Amino acid sequence: VRFVVRLLFLACLAATVLVPAGAAADRMWVGFHDDPMFRWDGTRLDALDRARANNATILRTIVDWTKVAPTRPAQATDPFDPAYQFGDVDEFVRNAQQRGTEVLITLWGTPSWANGGQKPQAMPTSLADFQDFARAVASRYSGRYAGYPYVRFFTIWNESNLATFLVPQFNASGKIVSPANYAKLAKAGIAGIKAGNRSAQIGIGETSSNGRDKKSAGTDTVAPATFMKGVAANMKGVKFDAWAQHPYPFPVNQKPTQLVRYPNVTLMSFPRFEKDLDAAFKRKNVPIWITEYGNETKPGEPKGVTEAQQAAYIPQAIGLARKDPRVQMFVWFVMQDSQGSLWQSGIYRQDASPKRAQPVFAKTAKPLSPVNGKMTVRGGTKNPKITVYLREYCANNPAGATVGYTIRSYLKSKLVAVSQGAAPLGLDCTVKPRVAKLTVAKKKTYRVTVTANTATTAEVLRTITIVGA
C-alpha cells in the first residue's frame, strides 16, 4: 500500500547536501553508469555488489521516456498511472539503495506519441508533456511513497549538443538552434522535477566533449562551450544546481591531460570553461558534474589505450577532477565491457575478470566519499550541525524512524566532546544532528565520528571532518 509521509516531506524540503570544503574537491560522488550491467543483465545483483566494492557512491542511469511511457498516460503527472512502465527502474533504484548508493537519473528520449511520430531525438511537440513526465519521475522517487526510494540527483537529456541525442542541431540555413531548443527542455524538466520533489538537485547540459559548430558530413554537432552559452542566453533567471559535462578524451587513445581547441571541453579545459560558465549564467562558481568519463581499451576498441594505460589514466583523471573545487561528481562509463556494446571502457572485461584498472579505481575512489564528509564552519561556532548520509537505512526503515547516535569529536588524537541523541530519518535518507559540546576553534580540524543505529538495522560508523575557518 502506498502512502504519503506529508509532514516529513515538508520538513525535508529545506534540506541541503553537505558540500565539499576547501580549495579542492576533497569529497565528491564517484561511481559508474552501466545500464546493461546494472539493470538488464542476469548478473545485475553481482554487478551492483562489485560497484559498491569498488567504492562507488553514485550510479547514473538513463530513464528513457520512450520506454517508460510507450503510450500516452491518462494522468501524466501521476507517477502510478497504468501507462507507465517503471519496472526495471524501480528495481535498480531499490537495489542501489540497499547497497547504500546514491542514484543519478538522466531523463531522455521523446515517445512517438509526443513528437508526431518522429525519433526519440526529436523535441516534444508540447513541452508540457515532458514537464509532466519529469514531475511523475521525480514524484515517484521523492521518498513520499513506501517502497520507492528517494533519488537525490537528476539531469535533463543526454549529450544534447549531438544530433545522436537531440535534433535539430541546425536549421535549414545552417544556424545553430539546439541550445535554444535544449533550454526549453531544461526549463520544462526543472519545473517538472521541482514539482515532484522540491529538494532534488538538478544538473543541465549533459554535453559531450566536442563538436563542430557547423553543418558538415556526418552527425551534426555543436561544441560544448558554444552550446552552453546558447543555453544560458535562453535560460535567464532559471535556477539549477550544476552543469553536467562529459569531458571524454578524443580521439579515444588520448590521456586525461590532453589539450584541445576551445570551445571543445575536456578536463584540462575546465578553468576556461568555468569562467565562461559563470559569465554566461551571471553566477559565481557554478558546480560541475562529470556524468560520463572513460578510457576505452584494446583489443575491444582497436584505437583505444592498453589496459596498463587505462589503469594509469584513472587516478590522473579523477585527480584532475579532485583538484577542481567545483567538481562534485565523477561518473565512469562503464563498469564492465558487455557483449554487443560499442564501449570498451569497463574496469572489468566481458567475462567479469578485472582489468588492471579495477583495483586502481577502487583505491582512488575510496577517500572521496561524501558519506564521510568534510565541512568548513566559522571559528567559534558552537554545536555545529552536520549531515549524516544513511542511505542503506531507508531500505529497511520508514521515513521518520528514530535513529540513535553517539557522536565523538577529536582534535588530533584527543577526545574533546562526546554526546548522544536521536533524530528522525529523513525522506532523503539523512539525519542532521548537532555536534553537542563542541566549539569549533579557528584554524583547527576536528574528526567527528558518528555511530548510528535503528531498532531494525545494524550499527554504522560515519566520520565527518570539520574545519574551523
Label the predicted regions:
Residues 15-23:
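C-terminal segment of classical bacterial N-terminal signal peptides
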Residues 54-217, 250, 298:
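Substrate-binding cleft and catalytic face of glycoside hydrolase catalytic domains
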Residues 143-144, 160, 165, 298-316, ...:
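Aromatic-rich peripheral "rim/lid" segments of glycoside hydrolase catalytic domains that contact
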Residues 451-455:
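Beta-strand-rich extracellular modules
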Residues 24-57, 62:
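Boundary/entry segment of secreted carbohydrate-active catalytic domains
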Residues 415-429:
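Solvent-exposed serine/threonine-rich low-complexity stretches and specific carbohydrate-binding patches
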Residues 459-466:
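Edge beta-strands of extracellular beta-sandwich domains
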Residues 41-44, 131-152, 173-308:
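Noncatalytic carbohydrate-binding groove/subsite architecture in carbohydrate-active enzymes
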